[in-house]
Amino acid sequence: MRYHAGDYDVIIVGAGHAGCEAGLAAARMGCKTLVLTLNLDNIALMPCNPAVGGPAKSHLVKEIDALGGQMGLTTDLAAIQMRMLNTGKGPAVYALRAQADKVKYQQLMKKNLETQENLDVKQLLVEEILVKNGRVTGVATQIGAEFSARAVVVTTGTYLKGRIIIGNVHFPGGPNSQFPSVNLSENLRSLGLELGRFKTGTPARVDRRTIDFTKMTIQPGDEEVHNFSYISPVTQREQVPCWLTYTTEKTHEIIRENLHRSPLYSGIIEGVGPRYCPSIEDKIVRFADKPQHQIFVEPEGLHTYEMYVQGMSTSLPPDVQLKMYRTIPGMENVSIMRPAYAIEYDYIVPTQLRTTLETKEIIGLYAAGQINGTSGYEEAAAQGIMAGINAALQVQEKDPFYLSRSEAYIGVLIDDLVVKGTNEPYRLMTARAEYRLLLRQDNADHRLTQKGYNIGLVSQVRYDHYMNKWQSISKEMERLKTIVIPANEETNKVLKSLESSEITQNTPFINLLRRPEIKYNTLAGLSDHFLDLPQEVIEEVEIEVKYEGYIKKQLAQVERFEKLEGRILNIDIDYEMIKGLSLEARQKLKKFKPTSIGQASRISGVSPADISVLLIWLEQERRKIAGGDA
């Protein structure tokens, strides 16, 4: 028997990384919000690797933080190791990665949800999204409780019809053998949504007391203090190392001998797996010529013996898992605490979503996270904050909020999903962004904090910090134009030590700083006019000066891009009536319903010639309207 259990503005179904950000965003924007989860103990669960960040992913975390989200702050508090990756490359691809104490991360995020004003958290299984006349009205739960809402965000992760697979054993389940969500999957289908099936997996967790670390290469954290959040204090934290080892020919031999027992090759697994995070058996088959593969052994936290074996994801039977793990140098006597497994799950085909992450067919129904076909905590959290923001704005009857490809990696992620779709678990990479130099992890606050403040998500404390920082950067950039470095013996001695050409006349500091080998602090001692500035200000000044020419070029590219994005296409256009479009273009445009010429140009099968036809048609329509007005 069903009963009415409460009224809310926004309801979030699921409390993983997408659900947490969605719930916090909606509540912080003033909406009465409810987060429903299968298990209160699994809020912000990290069922796979105990880490946050890495290439492109760190950019997402920084952008979430800049908008007023929580992931960066919580990671900084739960981190047990921090490393800046890609420092040998340009700043566009610098990437911060944190090893996190996964239990501490969960506890901190759970507390954030429980103490957030306007937010309730309840342990209930949602089985039905309630819809009336094409508009969402609430949700119904397994025990009969119904909650009304003007917007619902579905963030169910890998729980939709989840199936755990270990060897020839398979059973319904979510991550870490939790309950799956079965009926909700069928309910979404009944609402007219097209679902697909994906697969992912995770390696075994092993007992650190049974590992010989002397046979592995230590991977320590950086001595320099790093943070994901722009407002986290710059303080030293306790750090623990990770370890590097490799598979061997014996490892590969055991895997090859047991491929017939692999669900991946026996037909038990039907879902498509992630291209950029393949299982170890898939790697051995696809890269048969490689004699070894990297394996990273990572701590799951400070208060557990469990170690995560990155690079050894598998669904092979437990006896095979133990045999192959024991062929890894340093793991000859290893004990497995939790076996590796694969998980299959349903996902929503993301081309059914708008850029706001609202479904095209049902008003007020949003989806975010792995349910949209992505992989990764960071991708999920990024979608979560955007869906939460837009759900709140819809309730408040305000204009929707979205980010373009030229504004944020979040914009790249969402645009890829809703325009191109995905036929495998989607992972964001820096290579997917056209304007990488503009979308650096260091300047996410400059790009997004004002936007977050305008919609009511960024706090005054965060906003004041942002304003002070960027005012300092702007002032220092102007000030440096007035500082001149003398052409004397002391200066040239420093330049020579840096293998930089000497100067024969007094030179503006800003000109010297443009040289790749010159750092701000290197020359600071050559003048009496330097200030004691925060490191984040100095780093930003350096980047802006050194890459000024490249930045200007990308800004010009963005201007051209935005012209195409500004040419709006109504979703009710009858493409059959537009002469000159190819058959494939008509089919794709009808299916995906792009909202701009820019979006249309990124759909596979829509050629430059088709775009020209659309531009001509738009101009003809504009003239018709103008003529009618006259």
UniProtKB/Swiss-Prot annotation:
Required co-factors: FAD
Any GO BP: tRNA wobble uridine modification
Location (main, coarse): cytoplasm
Chain residues that bind NAD(+): 273-287
Location within or outside the cell: Cytoplasm
Record-level Gene Ontology MF annotations: flavin adenine dinucleotide binding
Positions with a binding annotation for FAD: 14-19, 126, 181, 370
Keywords: Cytoplasm, FAD, Flavoprotein, NAD, tRNA processing
GO CC terms, sorted: cytosol
Known function: NAD-binding protein involved in the addition of a carboxymethylaminomethyl (cmnm) group at the wobble position (U34) of certain tRNAs, forming tRNA-cmnm(5)s(2)U34.
Database matches in HAMAP family: MnmG_GidA
Protein family membership: Belongs to the MnmG family.
Record's subunit section: Homodimer. Heterotetramer of two MnmE and two MnmG subunits.
Name under which the protein is recorded: tRNA uridine 5-carboxymethylaminomethyl modification enzyme MnmG
Protein's organism: Desulforamulus reducens (strain ATCC BAA-1160 / DSM 100696 / MI-1) (Desulfotomaculum reducens)
Classification lineage: Bacteria, Bacillati, Bacillota, Clostridia, Eubacteriales
Gene: mnmG
